[in-house]
């Protein structure tokens, strides 16, 4: 006991000296390494005829830096890069790129918001990192989202070409139960395997490899559960605007100028009498200035129901143009051709700024959505500089009107 006590006292007494020695050794090592790098650079310059070495051109500005559009120092590793899931993801993507086999991507079965700001940018990163051949890739999604993936690959299969909307909803709900209530696609479930088998059979594929959404979810869970900062998302995504689409054969059935509108109920804008009254009043006021095209769909794929109803005059509907397998394509084209987009704040509203259309969205319950998804989306939109995006509490609408002088006459009358 006396010996251990004396040893501890000796360690405490010599701690400052040992720290000084450690720092000195570290400084000597760093100085030596710096001198070696300088010597290597000078040697390389002599071998290249004394030409000054220049750095490789930087990639495109990041959408997620504290100031959007700023360049990151390429020599710095972003937080989260060395996570076990990060290393597994890089190894998987590298193996897929070297496999020489067909690669099925998906199936994507859940909400559009995550698909737009996480899944598709993650795939863009994976394609570049693994040097994936677009001809080897087959994307599987639902609802006619092929145009969203055009920069990844033109090979696309739609789940709703294999299942009716009711079958899809029932099977997707069973998938959620199989995942113990989790909506996010965190596991490869029996429904996934069935879809993969159908796609493989249709295309005559064998020995396929799979890039499943669960890979992304396992990795990005560290950000969503606030274990690491947003730099994890930056390290494993490549953000870009959606590929351009045009109205095409839809043009003849639409007004020359219009605003696209999609009001549906969710936890941020629930289907209450107050919200129904707000939407009806807002659309009535909007149609005094411009035609409105409602993006209501005739089919129900999840627990979201439309709030806005067609009534008369300058409000137009396009539900007769949509099928289960093309509804996202039709809505995307209508949004791309619109003067602006208005509607419920939610994941679908991200389509508008990603297609270059300005968006004004509404919510009534601020506790009905997560701010981290909204913050990331707004940073992406600001960095891309395509379409602007505004989310507004319905209680603030009158304040905005006042700010622009719309209520001036009422205040004069009251005075």
Predicted feature locations:
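Short, small-residue-biased leader/transition segments that mark boundaries at the very start
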Residues: 1-2
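Active-site and donor-binding regions of nucleotide-sugar-utilizing enzymes
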Residues: 86-95, 100-204, 330-333, 348-351, ...
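Structural motif
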Residues: 101-104, 258, 340
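Short, aromatic/basic amphipathic alpha-helical patches
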Residues: 144-161, 304-313, 372-379
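A nucleotide-sugar donor-handling region in carbohydrate enzymes
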Residues: 182-264
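Catalytic donor nucleotide-activated moiety binding site of glycosyltransferases and closely related
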Residues: 256, 261-266, 276-328
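Acidic donor-binding loop of glycosyltransferase active sites
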Residues: 336-342
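Nucleotide-sugar donor-binding patch of glycosyltransferase catalytic domains
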Residues: 349-415
């Amino acid at each position: 006991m006396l010996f251990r006590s004396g040893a501890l006292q000796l360690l405490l007494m010599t701690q400052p000296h040992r720290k000084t020695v450690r720092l000195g050794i570290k400084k000597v090592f760093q100085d030596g390494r710096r001198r070696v790098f300088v010597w290597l650079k000078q040697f390389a310059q002599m071998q290249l005829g004394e030409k000054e070495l220049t750095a490789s051109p930087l990639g495109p500005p990041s959408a997620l830096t504290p100031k959007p559009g700023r360049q990151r120092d390429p020599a710095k590793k972003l937080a989260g890069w060395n996570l076990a899931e990060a290393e597994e993801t890089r190894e998987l993507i590298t193996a897929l790129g070297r496999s020489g086999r067909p690669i099925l991507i998906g199936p994507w079965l859940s909400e559009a918001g995550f698909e737009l700001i996480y899944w598709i940018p993650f795939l863009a990163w994976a394609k570049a990192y693994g040097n994936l051949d677009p001809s080897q890739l087959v994307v599987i999604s639902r609802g006619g989202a092929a145009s969203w993936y055009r920069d990844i690959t033109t090979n696309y299969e739609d789940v709703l070409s294999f299942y009716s909307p009711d079958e899809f909803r029932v099977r997707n709900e069973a998938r959620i139960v199989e995942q113990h209530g989790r909506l996010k696609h965190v596991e490869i479930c029996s429904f996934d395997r069935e879809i993969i088998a159908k796609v493989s059979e249709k295309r005559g594929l064998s020995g396929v490899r799979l890039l499943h959404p669960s890979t992304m979810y396992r990795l990005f869970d560290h950000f969503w559960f606030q274990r690491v900062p947003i730099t994890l998302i930056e390290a494993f995504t490549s953000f870009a605007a959606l590929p351009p689409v045009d109205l095409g054969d839809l043009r003849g059935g639409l007004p020359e100028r219009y605003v696209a509108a999609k009001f549906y109920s969710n936890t941020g804008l629930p289907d209450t009498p107050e919200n129904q009254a707000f939407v009806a009043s807002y659309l009535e006021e909007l149609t005094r200035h411009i035609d409105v095209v409602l993006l209501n769909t005739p089919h129900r794929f999840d627990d979201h129901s439309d709030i806005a109803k067609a009534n008369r005059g300058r409000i137009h509907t396009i539900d007769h143009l949509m099928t289960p397998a093309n509804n996202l394509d039709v809505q995307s084209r209508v949004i791309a051709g619109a003067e602006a987009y208005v509607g419920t704040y939610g994941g679908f509203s991200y389509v508008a700024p990603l297609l270059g259309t300005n968006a004004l969205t509404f919510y009534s319950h601020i506790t009905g959505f997560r701010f981290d998804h909204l913050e990331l989306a707004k940073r992406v939109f600001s960095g891309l500089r395509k379409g602007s995006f505004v989310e507004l509490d319905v209680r603030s609408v009158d304040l905005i009107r006042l700010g622009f002088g719309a209520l001036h006459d009422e205040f004069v009358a009251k005075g």
